[in-house]
């Protein structure tokens, strides 16, 4: 199998990278009716598998779970979750032949084995669904020509997909049809019905492509969403302790600081996050972010280049074949870092304190979000896609760190995201060490002293923040998400 993207000519590559259309709510007037009365079989019962299935069943669809024989015989976690929630469970051989839509929600590294097992069992004219296009785009999986291949990709972890549905809402979602596999021209109807059944149509749906979803998703998770948070956590903790801060306090300031800061980002973009600072602190955060962007731009561009070329995917798949040696080594090393092993702080940190003493962290968020967005757009990805894969998902990832530090983040994200995170953070930490050595008092761990500011400078900085393209597209997209619940901010 060959990387699908690399088999396309330049015009086709650009067309698929740039496919992105915000769909109107009237396009979902029929809800999930196209799949009513049809058999939907989900392969895999992890966070996405279970929670999408619960939503789809509540939307009136016929949902069952196909699991490997060993998982059923040994009553593994996937079997327990499906059966405890009242779903029909069976082997591939029992359920796949009757399925009208088979949805593969297993981890990326299992996709080829799963598709190899289920494809011969699928009836003529059935559909195969994904929530991430890695197997199609990067692996280059060949699917039978009579099978329709679609994607519905919620831009949130599976738990959020369920919680927002229960509130009568949903999460922003990308949908796509694989252009090589739409023999009956029904792919979009299937994808729309599936998205509606999960509740995604209530929060905004982008019609995208497998290529655009994969390339933007990989870029976001490697850089700002996971890699920048990991690198920032390690660098900021070490800096605080080096300057005499109690390790327990330093750990809490960082662990819960990302979540608190990015909650403002979620509600009002970079503008609101920066507005939480005093005027002197805002000017300093802006200056720091510009320095960071200049330093990190080549690293962000390298990650985007390696994602576009397929270099990243081939390296990761080589590690899969080597029993995840690199991944497991990096995971173990991360668990032994000073940040991960620091004691817990029992005192309370007020919400504003996270902003006042986290000017550098805010600068890192601003720089990382803007760089990821700019680098994607420069590579042909449309602004709406770039927004979802940079700014939108950041509060959700920050929330995982608030639960159990970097360990929790790396457990919750996919192995693909975790591998990319380590590649980025292992390069970013040494890259930023000279910058960290030049920080001033008030940049981290202490509030910047109040003082006079130059009105013209403040005006220009405010204009620069608010006029960035991500702020303009973000304001539009957040208009569809006003009902999404706040992420709880810890004390």
UniProtKB/Swiss-Prot annotation:
Associated pathway: Amino-acid biosynthesis; L-isoleucine biosynthesis; L-isoleucine from 2-oxobutanoate: step 2/4; Amino-acid biosynthesis; L-valine biosynthesis; L-valine from pyruvate: step 2/4
Cofactors: Mg(2+)
Pfam families associated with the record: KARI_C, KARI_N
Signal sequence residues: none
NCBIfam families on file: ilvC, PRK05225.1
Residues that hold Mg(2+) 2 according to the record: 217, 389, 393
E.C. code: 1.1.1.86
Active site residues according to the UniProt entry: 132
Full protein name: Ketol-acid reductoisomerase (NADP(+))
Gene from which this protein is expressed: ilvC
Lineage per the UniProt record: Bacteria, Pseudomonadati, Pseudomonadota, Gammaproteobacteria, Enterobacterales
Family: Belongs to the ketol-acid reductoisomerase family.
UniProt binding sites for NADP(+): 45-48, 68, 76, 78, 108-110, 158
SUPFAM superfamilies: 6-phosphogluconate dehydrogenase C-terminal domain-like (SSF48179), NAD(P)-binding Rossmann-fold domains (SSF51735)
Lineage: superkingdom: Bacteria
Protein's job: Involved in the biosynthesis of branched-chain amino acids (BCAA). Catalyzes an alkyl-migration followed by a ketol-acid reduction of (S)-2-acetolactate (S2AL) to yield (R)-2,3-dihydroxy-isovalerate. In the isomerase reaction, S2AL is rearranged via a Mg-dependent methyl migration to produce 3-hydroxy-3-methyl-2-ketobutyrate (HMKB). In the reductase reaction, this 2-ketoacid undergoes a metal-dependent reduction by NADPH to yield (R)-2,3-dihydroxy-isovalerate.
Residue span, KARI C-terminal knotted domain: 209-344, 345-484
Residues that coordinate or bind substrate: 414
Binding site for Mg(2+) 1: 217, 221
The KARI N-terminal Rossmann domain, residue ranges: 15-208
Co-factor: note: Binds 2 magnesium ions per subunit.
GO CC, alphabetical: cytosol
């Amino acid at each position: 199998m060959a990387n699908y993207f690399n088999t396309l000519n330049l015009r086709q590559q650009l067309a698929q990278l740039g496919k992105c259309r915000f769909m109107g709510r009237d396009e979902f007037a029929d809800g999930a009716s196209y799949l009513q009365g049809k058999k939907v079989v989900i392969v895999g019962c992890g966070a996405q598998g279970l929670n999408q299935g619960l939503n789809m069943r509540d939307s009136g669809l016929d949902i069952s779970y196909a699991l490997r024989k060993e998982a059923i015989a040994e009553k593994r976690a996937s079997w327990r979750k499906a059966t405890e929630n009242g779903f029909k469970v069976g082997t591939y051989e029992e359920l796949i032949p009757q399925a009208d839509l088979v949805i593969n929600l297993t981890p990326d590294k299992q996709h080829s084995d799963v598709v190899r097992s289920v494809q011969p069992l699928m009836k003529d004219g059935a559909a195969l669904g994904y929530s991430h296009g890695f197997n199609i785009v990067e692996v280059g999986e060949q699917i039978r020509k009579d099978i329709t291949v679609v994607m519905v990709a919620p831009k949130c972890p599976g738990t959020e997909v369920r919680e927002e549905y229960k509130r009568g809402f949903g999460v922003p979602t990308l949908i796509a049809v694989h252009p090589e596999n739409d023999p009956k021209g029904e792919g979009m109807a299937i994808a729309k019905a599936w998205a509606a059944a999960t509740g995604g149509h209530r929060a905004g749906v982008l019609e995208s492509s497998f290529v655009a979803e994969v390339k933007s998703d990989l870029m976001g998770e490697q850089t700002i969403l996971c890699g920048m948070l990991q690198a920032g956590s390690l660098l900021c903790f070490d800096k605080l302790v080096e300057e005499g801060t109690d390790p327990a306090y330093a750990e809490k300031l960082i662990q819960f600081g990302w979540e608190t800061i990015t909650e403002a980002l979620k509600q009002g973009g970079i503008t609101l996050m920066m507005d939480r600072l005093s005027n002197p602190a805002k000017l300093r955060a802006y200056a720091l972010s510009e320095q960071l962007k200049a330093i990190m731009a080549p690293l962000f561009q390298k990650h985007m280049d390696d994602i576009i070329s397929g270099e990243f995917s081939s390296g990761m798949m080589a590690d899969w074949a080597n029993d995840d040696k690199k991944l497991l080594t990096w995971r173990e090393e991360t668990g032994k870092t000073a940040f991960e092993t620091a004691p817990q702080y029992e005192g309370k940190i007020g919400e504003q304190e996270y902003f006042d003493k986290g000017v550098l962290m805010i600068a890192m968020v601003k720089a990382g979000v803007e760089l990821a967005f700019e680098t994607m757009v420069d590579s042909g990805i449309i602004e709406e896609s770039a927004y979802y894969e940079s700014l939108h998902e950041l509060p959700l990832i920050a929330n995982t760190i608030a639960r159990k530090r970097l360990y929790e983040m790396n457990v919750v994200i996919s192995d693909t995201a975790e591998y990319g995170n380590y590649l980025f953070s292992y390069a970013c930490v040494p890259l930023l060490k000279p910058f960290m050595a030049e920080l001033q008092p008030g940049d981290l761990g202490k509030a910047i002293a109040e003082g006079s500011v130059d009105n013209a400078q403040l005006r220009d900085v405010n204009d620069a923040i608010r006029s960035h393209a991500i702020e303009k597209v973000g304001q539009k997209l957040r208009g569809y998400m006003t009902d999404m619940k706040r992420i709880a901010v810890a004390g």
